[in-house]
């Protein structure tokens, strides 16, 4: 057996759903949930973390289909951190990973994140000022 030290590449974390014509029930993973595909079908949800550039799976959690994505990030991040035992990793995710609690969890564990902010609430109103404040002064063209 050989063991290789993988370089610290970005860790991608995202959820997806699988829907189908399945019987559900209280104890079933197959539940109705928010669906981009067909809300009349039951679904299961899978949260996965992979290591770039290989797409190497680091963790997979399958849950019932009615669960929200944002509550699945921290447990998956913790699973990855237990596996890699490193600080300074870059976690990449969608806007659901931008929840303040998830970002705070990453910072508390000395990790980095790259995720778009969800344009809801005060974020949508304040973002133009943040961008303006971050841009260098550019003299007008003559």
Regions found by a protein language model. Give the residues of each.
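Anion-binding and metal-coordination hotspots
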Residues: 1-142
């Amino acid at each position: 057996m050989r063991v290789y030290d993988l370089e610290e590449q970005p860790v991608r974390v995202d959820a997806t759903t699988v829907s189908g014509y399945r019987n559900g029930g209280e104890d079933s993973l197959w539940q109705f949930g928010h669906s981009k595909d067909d809300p009349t079908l039951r679904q299961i949800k899978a949260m996965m973390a992979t290591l770039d550039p290989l797409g190497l799976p680091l963790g997979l959690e399958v849950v019932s289909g009615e669960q929200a994505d944002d509550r699945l990030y921290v447990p998956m991040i913790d699973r990855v951190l237990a596996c890699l035992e490193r600080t300074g990793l870059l976690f990449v995710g969608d806007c659901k990973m931008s929840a303040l609690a998830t970002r705070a969890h990453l910072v508390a564990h000395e990790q980095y994140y790259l995720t778009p902010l969800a344009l809801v609430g005060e974020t949508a109103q304040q973002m133009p000022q943040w961008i303006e404040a971050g841009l260098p002064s550019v003299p007008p063209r003559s």
